[in-house]
Amino acid sequence: MIMSFFDQFLSPSFLGIPLIALAISIPWLMFPTPTNRWLNNRLLTLQAWFINRFIYQLMQPMNLGGHKWAILFTALMLFLITINLLGLLPYTFTPTTQLSLNMAFALPLWLTTVLIGMFNQPTIALGHLLPEGTPTPLVPVLIIIETISLFIRPLALGVRLTANLTAGHLLMQLIATAAFVLLTMMPTVALLTSLVLFLLTILEVAVAMIQAYVFVLLLSLYLQENV
């Protein structure tokens, strides 16, 4: 039976029970746990170095008020990277291709940054809606434009992550299907197609990590405006 290319984005279930929770919980059990030894192994050292560098790059432009968000942003980025990379494995479901999940991350965090700005420094937060030096006739128009751009931020966060991952998965499935069909008819072309698929897979690994970083980076920039 020929299945739709979009069937890979449907949530799988067994006996009516969704398997997303099990698929998400298993990888975290495989993460190494810290030891009491003075020197950690190579994997723990690499993991600690990566987390420290990410926190430094993300929190360096912020003031002290935004540093308390370091743990939340780091956990969110590691969570997104893990899900995105696991979604590249064959016969796996990628939850971050669902707009509902991405919006569930983007909307509350964006709204939190806006509310922090409104409560802590309402004058500065409202001042972002009107650039300095704006001519008087353009004030109403710019306020409307800036307000729309403010409320479209969480939608842009969710759609960006969903669209990039969905497009990559669809392209990989199309190329893999073409390589499988051409295997018996034109083996040479099928080999070249498989090589393209291998290179695209490497690219998608990079995209999976970059998109998780961009998602958290944009949230940190929104927070920086309001802290």
From Swiss-Prot:
Any single GO BP term: proton motive force-driven ATP synthesis
Record-level Gene Ontology MF annotations: proton channel activity; proton-transporting ATP synthase activity, rotational mechanism
Assigned keywords, A-Z: ATP synthesis, CF(0), Hydrogen ion transport, Ion transport, Membrane, Mitochondrion, Mitochondrion inner membrane, Transmembrane, Transmembrane helix, Transport
Principal place of residence: mitochondrion
Function comment: Subunit a, of the mitochondrial membrane ATP synthase complex (F(1)F(0) ATP synthase or Complex V) that produces ATP from ADP in the presence of a proton gradient across the membrane which is generated by electron transport complexes of the respiratory chain. ATP synthase complex consist of a soluble F(1) head domain - the catalytic core - and a membrane F(1) domain - the membrane proton channel. These two domains are linked by a central stalk rotating inside the F(1) region and a stationary peripheral stalk.
Location of this chain's protein in the cell: Mitochondrion inner membrane
Family: Belongs to the ATPase A chain family.
Protein name, per record: ATP synthase F(0) complex subunit a
GO cellular component terms given for this protein: mitochondrial inner membrane; proton-transporting ATP synthase complex
Gene3D superfamilies hit by this protein: ATP synthase, F0 complex, subunit A
Parts of the chain that traverse the membrane: 14-34, 69-89, 99-119, 139-159, 165-185, 190-210
UniProt superkingdom: Eukaryota
Subunit-level organization: Component of the ATP synthase complex composed at least of ATP5F1A/subunit alpha, ATP5F1B/subunit beta, ATP5MC1/subunit c (homooctomer), MT-ATP6/subunit a, MT-ATP8/subunit 8, ATP5ME/subunit e, ATP5MF/subunit f, ATP5MG/subunit g, ATP5MK/subunit k, ATP5MJ/subunit j, ATP5F1C/subunit gamma, ATP5F1D/subunit delta, ATP5F1E/subunit epsilon, ATP5PF/subunit F6, ATP5PB/subunit b, ATP5PD/subunit d, ATP5PO/subunit OSCP.
Membrane topology note: Multi-pass membrane protein
Swiss-Prot/TrEMBL catalytic activity: H(+)(in) = H(+)(out)
